[in-house]
Amino acid sequence: FTVALAAAEALKEQGITPNACAGFSLGEICALTFSGAFSQEEGIRLVCRRGELMQEAAEKHPGAMAAVLKLPNEEVEKLCSSFSEIWPVNYNCPGQLVVAGNPAQMPDFCKAVEAASGKARPLAVGGGFHTPYMQEASAAFLKILEDGEFSVNLPEIPVYANKTARLYGDPDKKETLAELLSAQIQNPVRWQEIMERLLAEGFDCFIELGPGKTLTGFGKRLIKGHEAKLLHVEDEKSLNETLAALGVQ
């Protein structure tokens, strides 16, 4: 959170401001904070509270996660429907969808993936995040957002929501910012759909902020057939490289 926010502020100091923002899972709070929905202090506090609530839920309802590779999303969804407690949770990019759910059912699910000519890679995580196992955490986080302790504002820069892959404040969607952000905890992250929507709307430069290049990796598959640029900022070196790529001296 802090590295990504610092990277965004560093770009802003050089005159680089986004036309839209999106964050993956926890990163959505960072995107909303930078966009003015929360102060920086509030953003940090929300990240901490969210983590505590999700950890409590994971301890109460243990879960497992696995990345499914080399299968269409629709086929993975169909496989999930054959299990009572396995759900698609992270739509990352074509050919990669993360699932989560009951640890007792996961081995058989992974065998079903392999039988369908896909690949299943168990993930070393402590819970079934973005599933109904997180319902109590989601409800508690909504209460925190609505009880008046935090100033919740509509973002000044457009932000795309993980739950809907649509903008916060979309007139076609009736959910408030607090409802969308809290519901994200127990619903899938629709990253692939967000990126596809941005590309369809004409966005052609994407800058990943924070440690690592995971989203950039997803982006390489998502921008195929598009004239689009993928950049990232995680330290001074990558900041300078990104500024150079943007023509900022």
Where are these regions (language model features)?
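FabD-like malonyl-/acyl-CoA
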Residues: 1-75, 120, 205-237, 243, ...
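Alpha/beta catalytic cores of group-transfer enzymes, especially the acyltransferase/condensing modules
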Residues: 34-179, 183-184
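Short glycine-rich catalytic loops that host catalytic nucleophiles or stabilize transition states
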Residues: 124-126, 199, 233-235
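Short Gly/Pro-enriched loop/turn and capping motifs at secondary-structure junctions
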Residues: 165-166, 188, 212-215
